[in-house]
UniProtKB/Swiss-Prot annotation:
The cysteine framework is XI (C-C-CC-CC-C-C). It comes from the Eukaryota. May embed in the membrane and bind to the voltage sensor domain of a ion channel. Does not induce paralysis when injected in fish, leading to the hypothesis that it may be part of the sedative nirvana cabal. Residues 21-45 form a propeptide. Belongs to the conotoxin I3 superfamily. It comes from Conus geographus. GO terms for cellular component: extracellular region. This is Conotoxin G11.1. InterPro entries: Conotoxin-I_CS. Expressed by the venom duct. It is found in: Secreted. Disulfide bonds join C46-C60, C53-C65, C59-C69, C64-C76. Residues 1-20 form the signal peptide.
Length: 77
């Protein structure tokens, strides 16, 4: 199942990266937005409230900002 999902994701990314244009502007905007979301810089978010975090003080409770707000073994910076 994981292999199938990985293959589908790779094919979708390959299709999006070829710059294939569609005649429908909405579809073109949707694929551009999806490509930007998949390949763009990843925003750090709180896992509970899904709010963006840029540092540990933006996180919920004792969570650390490490890609998302998450519980870590080592203390936060």
């Amino acid at each position: 199942m994981k292999l199938f999902l990985a293959i589908v994701l790779i094919l979708m990314l390959q299709f999006l990266s070829t710059g294939a244009e569609t005649s429908d502007n909405h579809a073109s905007r949707s694929t551009t937005a999806l490509r930007d979301w998949l390949l763009g810089p990843k925003a750090k978010r709180c896992a509970v409230t899904h709010e963006k975090c840029s540092d540990d003080y933006d996180c919920c409770g004792s969570l650390c900002c490490v890609g998302i707000c998450a519980k870590t073994i080592a203390p936060c910076k």
